[in-house]
């Protein structure tokens, strides 16, 4: 039995099949994403979605979808599916689906009368090329396939509508055509492995609707351009490969290329393998060979904080240390440029956020544990030292080392932590002053840097850092630990935030912590009682004021809920780490039960990955981005920790 397989009953029930999405990426920034019944429900959905750096830094939907029609004895059966206004779906091709399986590659089996047609999809690695293989498994009569492409040529942030500006020009290429709707865009090549006839009959399909955008309070409909259709006969047992790309390909190579791409795919036959596949989808390799971690799909770009938090789990936890080095090399170059006040040459957003250097050291600490401190010192010791010096010299524009040894930051006017939602131009959660995880990270960084200095034989520097850490530890306890046994979220003069928030889990989970064992247990206990859900830790306790756990509605409504009670799986990773460190093997069964909630997500929402956040109340529905790097990373890291404690 396949791990990710759905039968006819589910596939033909749109209430069950439409919420399930599927993502494929090329590891260079392009992706293909839709629902498992190929009905686009978001403006971000498309069969071929690619970066167009000549225009902007967004992805662009070139090919929205490809409708296939089976023709026998003059009767036509369209396998496509689109939603139009008024809850109208057409042409209802999902009713022909018999099963869907995506253990290795997404495979859909259609049955139309005596015809059984199999469709398999792969996205070629490092190329802007989607490949679809059609196989006529059975057919008792002469069969013709008609392919009708729906084109958008627009940013994922926008919509397209019928207009007179769009070019209808096209040129014949090897077994296909190339076309480009607007200046500045690359040509779209649509080719087949078999000779075909292209019928030019341009038309606009009007009023295609995307219900997910409607739910999010945005405009939700557009018009899609269809230049015509391709037709060809297909015999029983025959395969035809379709390619959509921004470059031409020799069509005689398509079948071998498809086989090669399939052979390179790892099966998604269990929870771990699904997460490994998801981890690879966040990879982005640029033409200059810079490597990045994308924060999530379908709308996030590369962000500095997300990169350093996600990097260990997405690489070290799946034994891909080399990719850690490649990403760290790129990120390190960018952060050194930032520290030296030079133009940033890498494509990493939010590199100026004050906790970024602290998370960078945390990531390198994980590298040291996975390899060795000697290896880390050799490759990254200088970078750690540079960061410590930079912070101590108060050169960061929004991070000040105070005389008490704590780090102070100004977050009143602009969000400066991972709780970064804003409304009306101001932070919804104005975390400012002494921020609990910033200072836990700082203490951890000082101790780790001291350990590296000791290995280097620099005893003077080691003792200096340890003395600084001791001062930070005492000030941390004096500032954050309250009479009820948990930690204030932030403190700024007389302003003390008593809210029970998950940021206090970090000093419990870190290798170097200012908290004693008893203090850690009290903090963990409160997190368990008030914040823990099957999908991670809530961003705010239900007992705290302003609890707003359901992430739905227009932008402003969602912004106010974003960090006010929603649950975040990546925080659950740190929670599980803290639990295992404190209670070791006695918590194994408890942590294994926690993993069930994350494994359930493999067959919901975006298959084989984990959504950005979840409602904080049952049934803990997945929301936000359909695949989120920090969530996948921290669950992978927790799985690795779980395995280490089991043996």
Q: What do the predicted segments below correspond to?
A:
Residues 138-139, 160-163, 172, 234-236, ...:
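Aromatic-rich carbohydrate-recognition surfaces in CAZymes
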Residues 78-105, 112-116, 393, 525-535, ...:
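Non-catalytic C-terminal accessory modules of carbohydrate-active enzymes
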Residues 273, 392, 399-402, 443-525, ...:
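Catalytic cores of carbohydrate-active enzymes
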Residues 198-232, 418-428, 432, 543-559:
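Glycine-rich phosphate/pyrophosphate-binding loop
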Residues 282-285, 289-302, 340-359, 363, ...:
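Carbohydrate-binding/catalytic loop surfaces
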Residues 252, 367-379, 448-464, 518, ...:
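Inter-helical turn/loop segments and adjacent helix faces that build the functional surface
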């Amino acid at each position: 039995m396949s791990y990710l397989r759905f039968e006819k009953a589910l596939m033909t029930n749109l209430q069950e099949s439409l919420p399930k999405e599927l993502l494929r990426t090329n590891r260079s920034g392009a992706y293909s994403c839709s629902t498992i019944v190929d009905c686009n429900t978001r403006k971000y959905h498309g069969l071929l979605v690619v970066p167009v750096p000549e225009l902007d830094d967004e992805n662009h939907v070139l090919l929205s979808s490809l409708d296939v029609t089976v023709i026998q004895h003059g009767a036509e059966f369209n396998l496509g599916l689109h939603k139009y206004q008024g809850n109208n779906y057409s042409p209802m091709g999902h009713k022909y689906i018999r099963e869907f399986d995506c253990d290795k590659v997404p495979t859909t089996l259609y049955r139309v009368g005596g015809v059984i047609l199999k469709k398999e999809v792969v996205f070629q690695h490092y190329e802007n090329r989607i490949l679809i293989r059609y196989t006529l498994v059975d057919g008792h009569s002469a069969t013709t396939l008609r392919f009708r492409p729906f084109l958008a040529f627009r940013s994922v942030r926008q919509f397209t509508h019928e207009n007179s500006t769009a070019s209808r020009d096209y040129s014949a290429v090897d077994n296909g055509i190339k076309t480009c709707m607007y200046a500045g865009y690359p040509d779209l090549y649509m080719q087949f492995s078999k000779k075909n006839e292209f019928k030019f009959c341009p038309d606009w399909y009007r009023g295609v609707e995307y219900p997910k955008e409607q739910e999010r309070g945005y405009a939700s409909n557009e018009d899609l351009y269809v230049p015509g259709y391709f037709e060809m006969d297909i015999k029983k047992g025959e395969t035809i490969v379709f390619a959509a790309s921004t470059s031409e390909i020799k069509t005689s190579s398509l079948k071998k290329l498809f086989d090669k791409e399939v052979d390179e795919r790892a099966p998604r036959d269990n929870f771990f393998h699904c997460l490994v596949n998801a981890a690879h989808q966040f990879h982005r390799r640029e033409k200059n060979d810079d490597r990045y971690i994308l924060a999530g799909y379908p709308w996030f770009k590369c962000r500095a904080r997300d990169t350093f938090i996600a990097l260990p789990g997405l690489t070290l936890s799946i034994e891909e240390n080399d990719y850690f080095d490649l990403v760290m090399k790129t990120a390190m170059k960018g952060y050194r440029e930032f520290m030296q006040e030079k133009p940033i040459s890498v494509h990493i957003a939010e590199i100026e956020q004050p906790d970024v250097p602290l998370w960078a050291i945390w990531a390198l600490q994980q590298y040291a544990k996975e390899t060795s401190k000697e290896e880390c010192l050799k490759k990254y010791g200088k970078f750690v030292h540079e960061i410590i010096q930079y912070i101590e010299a108060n050169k960061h524009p929004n991070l000040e080392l105070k005389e008490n040894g704590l780090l102070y930051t100004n977050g009143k006017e602009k969000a400066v932590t991972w709780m970064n939602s804003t409304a009306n131009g101001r932070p919804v959660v104005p975390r400012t002053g002494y921020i609990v995880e910033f200072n836990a990270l700082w203490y951890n960084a000082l101790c780790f840097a001291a350990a590296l200095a000791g290995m280097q034989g620099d005893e003077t520097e080691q003792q200096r850092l340890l003395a600084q850490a001791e001062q930070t530890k005492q000030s941390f306890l004096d500032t954050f630990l309250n009479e009820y046994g948990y930690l204030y979220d932030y403190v700024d003069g007389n302003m003390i935030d008593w809210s029970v928030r998950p940021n206090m889990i970090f000093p419990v989970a870190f290798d170097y912590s200012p908290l004693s064992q008893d203090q850690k247990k009290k903090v963990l206990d409160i997190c368990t009682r008030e914040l823990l859900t099957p999908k991670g830790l809530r961003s705010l306790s239900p007992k705290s004021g302003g609890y707003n756990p359901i992430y739905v509605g227009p932008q402003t409504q969602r912004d106010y809920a974003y960090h006010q009670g929603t649950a975040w799986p990546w925080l659950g990773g740190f929670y599980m780490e803290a639990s295992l460190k404190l209670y070791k093997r006695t918590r194994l069964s408890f942590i294994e039960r926690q993993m069930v909630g994350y494994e359930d997500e493999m067959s919901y929402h975006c298959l084989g990955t984990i959504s950005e956040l979840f409602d904080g109340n049952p049934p803990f529905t997945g929301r936000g981005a359909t695949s989120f790097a920090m969530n996948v990373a921290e669950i992978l890291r927790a799985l690795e920790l779980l395995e280490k404690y089991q043996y």
